[in-house]
Amino acid sequence: MQFHSSSALITPFKKDLSVDEAAYESLIKRQILQGMDACVPVGTTGESATLTHKEHMRCIEIAIETCKNTKTPSNSCMKVLAGVGSNATSESLSLAKFAQKIGADAILCVSPYYNRPTQQGLFEHYKTIAQSVEIPVMLYDVPSRTGVSIEVPTALKLFREVPNIKAIKEASGSLKRVTELHYYEKDFKIFSGEDSLNHSIMFSGGCGVISVTGNLMPNLISQMVNCALKQKYQQALEIQNKLFHLHQALFVETNPIPIKMAMHLAGLIENPSYRLPLVAPSKETIQLLEKTLQQYEVIA
């Protein structure tokens, strides 16, 4: 996985709640031009749980087409880490095969949500999906959403026994897990999935981030990651601290509710539309977002 900085892309909707493909393409181009290494379509932030199978595949397709046709400032192509998560292994497997077929560089697969599988069930789930493709696979541990954690021994076993499982997105909130994973397997790539811990995870052995805030501030997220990779940790910390209030504001309600509203307020998407059961943020949250964006000089 030859990338380090990436954003968990939002999925913009039109007023009729269909996917706004033109806006989606525009957002991806902005990521490319502002220095991100990769984009992550249809993950949690992309509201994958309320997309149809056809919409899910189309979003992956748009991301791949846009990255292929838009060069980065260094004249390369931004990588696509395609989200293929589902609580049905068969559906994740189908999405993984599709993503590989149309040119995804790697896939991100969240643990099955609601089912609450055992550790053996998680092992078989990930093994089955990974063995169906040849491209790299990133595990995704976010127990606050899935109801179950990929325990450290299970994650290590998957890395050791399944050749194309190369990385894990850590959104557990536990730095202890990060240090354990890095201690036992230095080549197991760890990506931060929690913006408030980006610097801490990078300092503890992480090699990159998958950021929600990066939708709005891709340039600063990219700069922070690049500083950390060069072991310029003080500079990275300064950027992390600069983003502190924005990170806080973007998670006062369930993700991606605040980030979509922030993107709308910043003029980056026309409609801050959500599919039920997600709803628009409260008046208080909108006021907080406006104040925060003014603080960062995103809006006047």
From Swiss-Prot:
The Gene Ontology biological process terms listed for this entry are: diaminopimelate biosynthetic process; lysine biosynthetic process via diaminopimelate
Q: Where in the cell is it found?
A: Cytoplasm
**Taxonomically, which superkingdom?**
Bacteria
EC annotation from Swiss-Prot or TrEMBL: 4.3.3.7
Recite the UniProt keywords alphabetically. Answer: Amino-acid biosynthesis, Cytoplasm, Diaminopimelate biosynthesis, Lyase, Lysine biosynthesis, Schiff base
Spell out the protein name for this chain: 4-hydroxy-tetrahydrodipicolinate synthase
Its biological purpose is as follows: Catalyzes the condensation of (S)-aspartate-beta-semialdehyde [(S)-ASA] and pyruvate to 4-hydroxy-tetrahydrodipicolinate (HTPA).
* Reactions that this protein is recorded to catalyse: L-aspartate 4-semialdehyde + pyruvate = (2S,4S)-4-hydroxy-2,3,4,5-tetrahydrodipicolinate + H2O + H(+)
According to its UniProt record, which protein family does this protein belong to?
A: Belongs to the DapA family.
CDD domains, per database record: DHDPS
Q: Where is the signal peptide?
A: none
Pathway named in the protein's UniProt entry: Amino-acid biosynthesis; L-lysine biosynthesis via DAP pathway; (S)-tetrahydrodipicolinate from L-aspartate: step 3/4
Cite the PANTHER family for this sequence: 4-HYDROXY-2-OXOGLUTARATE ALDOLASE, MITOCHONDRIAL, DIHYDRODIPICOLINATE SYNTHASE
Subunit info here reads: Homotetramer; dimer of dimers.
Swiss-Prot/TrEMBL site (Part of a proton relay during catalysis) positions: 44, 114
A GO CC term attached to the entry: cytosol
Locate the residues binding pyruvate.
45, 210
The record, for Pfam families, names: DHDPS
Q: Which GO terms describe its molecular function?
A: 4-hydroxy-tetrahydrodipicolinate synthase activity
Matching entries from InterPro entries are given as:
Aldolase_TIM, DapA, DapA-like, Schiff_base-form_aldolases_AS
User: Coding gene?
Assistant: dapA
